[in-house]
């Protein structure tokens, strides 16, 4: 990686971590467009990628920022130094809206962290029981893509997002 690429990657992570919550999607998109890597591994921060960084910043992560990173190719199932995924971190913060987005983009709730826990086990450990319902409904949705299941997922998420 050349110096310019390194600087762009660091600026993207810094912007995601330190800008205010309503961080400008235009700036993020511009950084990515000119070469910042949405899958850049920050070796100084647990080998996190930008999507993990934005979820670290706050339990109220901007859904549009998360969607933009995913639309630009962020790996939804990337595991950091501790094998933690974006979904696992989101569950710890109890952010149902972000969890739904991650699951919509294909987050795998069965990956294991360094303690051999998957997202379901983490939801139980952190007592985020509604998250278990969401994950179970996504499993059903993947097997039987019905409108009834999608509506139930939206209903549960909306209870906690509104």
From Swiss-Prot:
ANK repeat intervals: 10-40, 47-78, 82-111
Repeat among keywords: yes
SMART domains: ANK
Pfam families: Ank_2
Keywords annotated in UniProt: ANK repeat, Repeat
PANTHER family for this protein: ANKYRIN REPEAT AND SOCS BOX PROTEIN 8, ANKYRIN REPEAT-CONTAINING PROTEIN DDB_G0279043
Entry protein name: Putative ankyrin repeat protein R664
Higher taxonomy: Viruses, Varidnaviria, Bamfordvirae, Nucleocytoviricota, Megaviricetes
